[in-house]
Amino acid sequence: MTTGPATPPQTNHAEDRTEWPIQVLRAAPETYLLQEILKLAEVAIDTDGHPPFSDQTLIQLRSANAPLLILLSYVPAAPEVPAALAGVAVVLEHDGQPASGTLELVVHPTYRNQGVGQVLLKSLQSARGFESLNAWSHGSHAAAQQLADQFGFEAVRALRRLRLALDAGHQLPAASLPTNISLRSFVPDQDEAAWLAVNAAAFAHHPEQGETSLADLKSLMEEQWFDAAGFLLAVDETDQIMGFHWTKIHAAPAGHQAIGEVYVVGIAPAAQGKGLGKALTLAGIDYLQKKGLSSIMLYVDADNTAAVSLYQSLGFARWDADTMYSYPSATNSNNKFQ
């Protein structure tokens, strides 16, 4: 983090009389500014029912040497009035991949439909450009689609959010583990290295998950929601990890109930094709149900038909979706979805 006060926001004079001053940071924010960003995110969660930033982005916002570009839009105010955040855009640049980044953007509900998103994207275009940039729309808002169209981004990936209602009449089959496999919980300061190896192998073709580092893992373990007991490991007779189901419980935001999540399910390549994925999924759901939760959610790529079919067979139904947009120069046309 920077050691002194952040640079005062500069007004974007290209806009009309309703100007939204913009501040650009090329590093993780100072503590006070991080708290303001997180407060804005919480307000958005209360309104939208889902977070505007991924866990990875939240980790990087707290990391001193994170490869970040942050743009903050402020509410126009008199000089003596403390500036309030109207919106935030965060670009996480990917290590080892020049000019390759992932954008997430959120506008305070009070200031939506007033041009804040446009100002943030115009400022981002000036500060960085859109080359090799992917952008997530969490919840696939219509306003995000309009911004994507306006700035020339194209939809390239759909991530479905599914939900399972655990009412009294819904019975799930018991988890049936393969022979010589047993379940235990993750043990902090013991299982990190072994889990990272299995996670990397299980998600070798899924960089968002497979590139999780020890620092990333430790940051997640420091989150308030982390529960080692709900981090289930499938181990063989030598205690080697063959798979895992990391569960998560989202605290109840205003107007919403607490909800469990099938956070990550991963299977070591040597154990794939043996039914372990389904067994771990069921074991995690059972754990969450015993915590008193009545709803379970998960994310799954829309084109992962095998996983979608499995979850639907267990009673999961579509809730909403996230959409990834990409600037054309960074888009492989073969990956576009219709």
Swiss-Prot record:
CDD domains attached to this UniProt entry: NAT_SF
InterPro entries named among the record's database cross-references: Acyl_CoA_acyltransferase, GNAT_dom, MshD_Acetyltransferase, Mycothiol_AcTrfase
All copies of domain N-acetyltransferase, residue ranges: 29-173, 181-338
GO annotation terms (biological process): mycothiol biosynthetic process
Binding annotation for acetyl-CoA 2: 265-267, 272-278
Signal peptide residue numbers: none
Positions annotated to bind 1D-myo-inositol 2-(L-cysteinylamino)-2-deoxy-alpha-D-glucopyranoside: 55, 208, 248, 261, 299
Enzyme class: transferase
Coiled-coil ranges per UniProt: none
Chemical reaction(s) catalysed: 1D-myo-inositol 2-(L-cysteinylamino)-2-deoxy-alpha-D-glucopyranoside + acetyl-CoA = mycothiol + CoA + H(+)
Gene Ontology MF: a single term: mycothiol synthase activity
SUPFAM superfamilies referenced in this protein's UniProt entry, alphabetically: Acyl-CoA N-acyltransferases (Nat)
Keywords recorded for this protein, A-Z: Acyltransferase, Repeat, Transferase
Residues the entry annotates as binding acetyl-CoA 1: 105-107
EC numbers for this chain: 2.3.1.189
Family: Belongs to the acetyltransferase family. MshD subfamily.
Function: Catalyzes the transfer of acetyl from acetyl-CoA to desacetylmycothiol (Cys-GlcN-Ins) to form mycothiol.
Family annotation (HAMAP family): MshD
Subunit structure: Monomer.
Name listed for the protein in its UniProt record: Mycothiol acetyltransferase
Organism encoding this protein: Renibacterium salmoninarum (strain ATCC 33209 / DSM 20767 / JCM 11484 / NBRC 15589 / NCIMB 2235)
Phylogenetic lineage: Bacteria, Bacillati, Actinomycetota, Actinomycetes, Micrococcales
Gene field: mshD
